[in-house]
Amino acid sequence: MKLLLSYIIGLFLILSLSACHDGGNATTLLHQADSLMQEFPDSALSLLESISHPEKLSGSERADYAIFLTRARTKLYVHESSDSLIRFAVDYYKRSWNNERKMQAYYYRGCVYRDMRCMDLAVKDFLQALKVIPKESEYLYLGAIYENLAGCYAEQNLYKDAMHAHHKAHEIYIKQKKDDGLFYAVRGIGYVFMLQHQLDSALVYYQKALD
């Protein structure tokens, strides 16, 4: 079944790329990439990278392209070394009424700053994302924002803040019944205990993460 699904996605990708070269437009590719993003970020990334001259896109499309491309790279653990792309999306959406895109722009710029080891800037963007996150986006993003905040605080030796953020993520993932999120939150709590040389407590939480 998984092999068949991969084949279908691959065929869809080939047809999409062909459509692009045969006169299809960037708007279609952006919609297709967005629909594939959550389950197939590698396919979404391929579609986005097939868009020629993204700098010529209209304002909203260029901003969405920046968000989608950064999202795909983040999901595939591609390290970012510059904020120039996602900064355009933040500048475009920061005065917009579209809170979902505004939140995504701040969140993914925060992820880029975390990659760049600019923890102060990352924290500011994650906190801004929390301020504007709409209810319908909480399932995908709320726990992730707190987990990223926790990671930034831990890097800055702000262990109390890191622990608080991990516990917030833990509460959220329990309510959402997201087992994968719970694993990362519990493991994160253990990691913060380890950083504080509280090894017994760290071991307890690492064991909980494995259970």
Can you describe what each PLM-predicted range is?
Residues 1-6:
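Positively charged n-region of N-terminal signal peptides that target proteins for export
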Residues 7-16:
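Bacterial N-terminal signal peptides
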Residues 20-211:
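A "functional boundary" signal
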